[in-house]
Amino acid sequence: MRTAVAELPDEDFARPSGCAGWRVRDLVCHLIIDAQDVLITLVTPAETEPTRNAVTYWEVAETPPTGDDPLDALTVRMAAAYEEPWLLKFHLDDVGSAAGRAAELADPGLWVSTRDEVFTAGDYLSVYVLEWTLHHLDLIAHLPGAAEPPAESLAGAREMLERIAGAAFPTSWSDTDALLVGTGRRAPTDAERAELGELGELPAKFPLFLG
């Protein structure tokens, strides 16, 4: 993800992203906040047992985000304050690389606390594999030729999304298509809708609007 952002030309930061109401620069600012959250959480140990795991972390909404949330609006203002794309690139690389090192050093079994919930560090970091993979797809949604997420990340994110839904996508679907359709980032084609229909109750489970 950091590499994909670092390679973007400046003009791409003003283009729309796959997140409602956000340009690429706003999404990159959100990724910086995410990386800071990882750093803070990994050094916030908990004394009580985990209350959630990588699957139950997610709240599934009935409608897609609109971009009108106050925190979303704050992110837009913060992104604008950077003014120059290189500053966003620098800050993401700086904080993101630190978060990556912290993740590598963390004991997966360590109990950590965030948002008034307790997780193992391993489960908490698994949450971010899904989140950042989806946001990588958001980043390149309108940027043909931009670097795609690693295959390993796509496969892991798909598996996690299927666990959240309690159902699997058609095996003929690519991981990218499963993630985009499964989270409502794009509508299924007629052929995809037909495949979903052949799987019984599966269509009723998707899309999942994760929050």
Positions of PLM-derived features:
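Structured surface interface patches that mediate subunit assembly and partner/cofactor docking
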Residues: 43-55, 81-83, 90, 102-211
